Amino acid sequence: MELFQAKDHYILQSGDNALWCSRKDGSMAVRPATDLLLAWNPVCLGLVEGIIGKMQLHVDLPLGLILIRQKALVGQLPGDHKVYKITKIVVIPLSEDEPQDLELELCKKHHFGINKPERITQSPDETKFLMKTLSQIKSNVGAPIKKKVKENKEKERLERRLLDELYKIFMDSDSFYYSLTYDLTNTVQRQGELGKSDQPLWKRVDDRFFWNKHMIKDLVDLQAPQVDFWVIPIIQGFVQVEELVVNYNESSDEERSSPETPLQEPTCVDDIHPRFTVALISRRSRHRAGMRYKRRGVDTDGHVANYVETEQLIHVHSHTLSFVQTRGSVPVFWSQAGYRYNPRPRIEKGERETMPYFASHFEKEVETYKKLVIINLVDQNGREKIIGDAYLKQVLLYNNPNLTYVSFDFHEHCRGMKFENVQTLTDAIYDIITDMRWAWVDQAGVICQQEGIFRVNCMDCLDRTNVVQAAIARVIMEQQLKKLGVMPPEQPLPLKCYRIYQVMWANNGDTISRQYAGTAALKGDFTRTGERKLAGVMKDGVNSANRYYLNRFRDAYRQAVIDLMMGHPVTEDLYSIFSKEKEHEEKEKESQRGAQEQVSLLLQTYMQLLLPDDEKFHGGWALIDCDPSLIDATHKDVDVLLLLSNSAYYVAYYDEEADKVNQYQRLSLEGLEKIEIGPEPTLFGKPKYCCMRLHYKNGETSGYFHTLRSVTRNPEDDGKDTLQCIAEMLRITKQAMGLDVQVVEKKLERRHSKPHEDIMGIQGKAVDQVLGSGLAQGKSFFLNKFSTLNQKVKQTKTNVNIGNFKPLGKLGTFSKPEVKVNFLKPNLHMNLWKSDSSLETHDSNTGSGALKDHGPHSEEISSDSDSYNSDEQPCSGSRENVDYVLPSCGIVASAPRLGSRSQSIGSVEIAVPSVIRVTGCDEKTMDSLSVAADQSPGAASEAEEAILIDFGTPIDVYCHQFVQDAKTKPIEVFEEVAPAPKPQGPQVPLAPDAKLGSSHSQNQLPRPSQLEVESNVHGANLLTVQPVGSATSCGSQKSLEGITGPSSADSNGSRVVSPFAKIRSSMVQVASLTQAGLTQGINFAVAKVQKSPEPDAVNETQENELRAMFTQCQTRIIQI
């Protein structure tokens, strides 16, 4: 269609249809094409593909007419319906000002032989004269004009920023699609239910996905029959169409694995091998649309953020089969302040206040899809747990039999990029997948319908969700193809088809992610193991200040544009963002200083842990190991700490997922052969970084080296200066030993090092050597948690944001405790900052696991072959001014003083339980479950000395832990939460199918796959805590020795347990002991650290209510 510019109107004309849009007030009118003769001096500007609508970017700016400037054919859906992607748009201001260069394709009819369109514009001489006149006027009234010019500049700047974001939304993310003949907003099943209709396409669309509804509103309101030609429904989402051939003999190397590859006609039609068309259509809801950290959870209309309906179409001959899934944010009121890496989620409203809006959301879903299977992929421990718990609680309160709730901790099952473990989920719910079926239509009509949908979510509803949806859709597709006879019954999908299918879903995930989380420029930072994230200071040099800028400023503009597109008021003052941007520079400097301090603290900690007493510390650096031998399909640069002593250097490898150093290598300086510095080895392109290669000998064998590069904050800095300084220090240190090392600057060769043989794992010591010490070892605790260091940073550096420094900066993140015993080396020296405040405890009944004062130079933990050596200061005999190490609950109960960070004490008394035992509760020891009601907090140490864990069945622990979690209110201190009160007798009944036998005779407790609880069973055994006196009264019990070792299933990360309890090998380990509140003493210790009040009494009414919810719930609750 042609675009004309007249004096008062812009005119779109296609055949006999013409649309007039006023340049004064933006009003629209549909007129005959012959009325073009009535326009004043119309000039053809070029060709356009259609109209999206009009919108006003700001009250100070004119309306803009948004037109489709360029489109691209995506493919053809069944019925030869062509689908197009909008690749370029043009925005024309509806004002009397002349439009700038629109770069439209020229109309051959009106621009024959003309390269550029003519314009209604003034001559150059007239323009010069007017400019001269204006300059004279400005000089005469300079003072008033200056202020107005400044305002105009700000207005122009704001217009440029908003216009730039509008162009990026449409052009950078491949997000908007349309079809002139097919309803992209409705699924095949909904179209079949609507039946054939003579109504125009835009009147049959699903209102949720009609993205330009508000922008085209003025045109629709004309209510003229001629309007139907101009209204084009547009969806935001993703569409890809591919034709696949089921050929088991064909090589997969020639597959077309990229959507950018142009469509090609098959050169040879082979009738032997069946063909089918697969299409993927994702539709994003226009309700609660926006960016990730601007739009979370549910709103007051029951709409959720990032709601996307994804339909997979299979077309064979005349048969079309459809399978639909949805994704959407957790429908509770929650938010994340996206101004730092991995911000902590926060619940905005209470559960009672949330209930009506949660119900409103699912009522609409049930009305549309009949039945829903919720698959919740959020982490069931750590930061995300608060969201998962709130979700489950709302499901119980809603109590709808049309819902099924499935909980699957994706990160635990698929740790280490083991995506094949998603099959654990699909196998567990295979019957549900089969019962859900799919929609099936042919030329005669509807054959069958899909009964329900899967509603999948993680925190962002991005990558985890996409992986799981692709896995479920693949199961359905194979069932469909086998049903149609396209695939043999016992054969999997051919490799070539599967690869193309994988790429389609990967493209879908990338596109949805760019729409919700950012632009395509950040695609390199997108990982398939979890939600989208920046690699942080230690990865690609992208510091937290850039992350802050990205979310704070860019997202503010983009969110404003999206709100304007949807017709929502802009809540943020866009002019105020200009002044906030100036603050960004100060924030950036402050963030850099904070990151440097955190690196220094981390190096100091590992210097104390790794270096023995007879070595002197000479320097430490945070570097990146970029050894080419590590590069593969899943390659990531590995963060390392390089520590230098007077006789050796240490390379400590930091595990990003475990948030700790899990391996290290000690290399003698005598074996350091040479140091090479030069550009990194690359296959293509110019090297981006400078690297340092440290060659060393292993015994008498050469060929070993580490390739390291520095962390650069400036993109123009290759880090060479830092590496040269490190090399010089290594050379000087070796010269002090009477030896020398050669430093060479050259281009590094792309070759592999021999496998390093001296790497020491932190889990290197046998489990049987810890023989019931009662704790997960203080050494492992200090290595994993850095709790004392965190307390010191918290007290002395309040302006340091620990969460920003990723991955090495996660000092404040308490990860889920594992049933592992980690050892660094036999003799470990630890320095703890001395507390100014003490924990009031009783000195009596100190267990055998407590530290004893053996003199001024050593302390020893009994029942442990490993010893702890302190500095040369004697231990005080009292329990004042000490740090209590409680690894059993993953905390340090300490109150570091605000003095100098360098002040430390050499010896520490650690009040630890002597024994942690597991029993089956078959003995009647319920009378010793709790401490006397009048016991003061100071008397809590009796329960710390020996802890006896009693439980009945997995169902008991599952329900009991949920009761405890429901009463626990999180506190924003390093991921710790306020402890729950101690259990008060039997509170949760047994499952009807639970076995009541003694756990001594059980080899393995079954893991509950479905929560079905009845209230008529009495005498249930619970997770209980016994005081010291009862610890020795039980029958033969196993010590910690039997439960601390990781099982074979743990080693590959493929086995995951309940979100509230770990059920493994005759024991149940509560996933978060800080929340279990095992003893009042631990409660008091946690409260002391967090400066929180002591826990209140048990709310029996709330507990009974929660128990009734479990027993009466009509929703299936499944834990995988």
Swiss-Prot record:
Cellular localization per UniProt: Membrane, Clathrin-coated pit; Early endosome; Recycling endosome
GO cellular component terms, semicolon-separated: clathrin-coated endocytic vesicle; clathrin-coated pit; early endosome; recycling endosome
Biased composition (Basic and acidic residues): 851-860
Ranges of biased composition (kind: Polar residues): 864-879, 998-1007
Ranges where the hSac2 domain occurs: 593-760
BP term (GO), one: phosphatidylinositol dephosphorylation
InterPro entries the record matches: hSac2, Inositol_phosphatase, SAC_dom
Reactions mediated catalytically: a myo-inositol phosphate + H2O = myo-inositol + phosphate
PROSITE patterns linked to this entry: HSAC2, SAC
Record keywords: Coated pit, Endosome, Hydrolase, Membrane
Disordered: annotated segments: 837-881, 979-1008
Gene Ontology molecular functions: inositol monophosphate 4-phosphatase activity; phosphatidylinositol-4-phosphate phosphatase activity; protein homodimerization activity
Known EC number: 3.1.3.25
Domain spans labelled SAC: 167-518
Known role: Inositol 4-phosphatase which mainly acts on phosphatidylinositol 4-phosphate. May be functionally linked to OCRL, which converts phosphatidylinositol 4,5-bisphosphate to phosphatidylinositol, for a sequential dephosphorylation of phosphatidylinositol 4,5-bisphosphate at the 5 and 4 position of inositol, thus playing an important role in the endocytic recycling.
The protein's name in its UniProt record: Phosphatidylinositide phosphatase SAC2
Organism name: Danio rerio
